[in-house]
Amino acid sequence: MNLLAFGGGTKRTAKADAVITGAGSGIGRAFATELIARGGRVVCADIDEVGAAETAERLGDRALAVRCDVGSIDDVIALADTAEGWFGKPADLVINNAGIGTGGAVVGETSLADWRKTVDVNLWGPIHGCHVFAPRLRAHGRGGIINVASAASFAAAPRMSAYNVTKAGVLALSETVSAEMAGTGIAVTVVCPTVVKTNIFDSDTIADSASGLISTLVKWTGVEADSIARGVLNAHDRGQFYVVPQLDAKVIWQLKRLAPRTYTHMLGLVERAAR
């Protein structure tokens, strides 16, 4: 159940010129579609050139596809320059959404290659995005940053160490940037969803032993990406920082804070049952 799709105006996101990473599919494509519906223009960035082009083609002449590897600072700088040139001004909104799923193995069995790949995309991506776009937004004097983290940033589920760590980093980065942007006219929002119906877990960093469970979760509990995107943009319009859109994530968020020992014990039971 998505609790955010209802209500909320479109003042901040109306007619926004936005840059979206990971816009070739999933939540990124949904953000682009919703922003176009709100009268904006979007730069659809993705390492998957075909996916980015498909998104832009669907959206018409107010969308531009750009290939970007968010793990490369040079690519992100080029993305910002391209967007500014196309818009004719700095972007109003930056959505650091690109990410990959990783899971299925315990610490010590997750390969270092998977760790590095996950950190490069999931953590360095938002770091690069904030590093490059934050100064431009400050100079612009208005706008916003939306960072897509995950409920994994606080849930700490077993066998998802690399994913958990990177998303926790995105949450901490967002909290820091929000404080640093206070009084500048720049709004910051961080999104912490659980299961969304996207292809993020269609990755070689997902162990075969976990792929079946993930597919089942997506099928039976996943929320549609367009519902998440709409709710997040509405929340950003309201100036909301933390966005925890689904009921299961809200329960985890509260349980961990109100009863941390109980929560940790429950995670241990889940891990033992999975062996």
PLM feature segments, named:
Residues 38-54:
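Conserved glycine-rich Rossmann-like NAD(P)H-binding loop of the short-chain dehydrogenase/reductase
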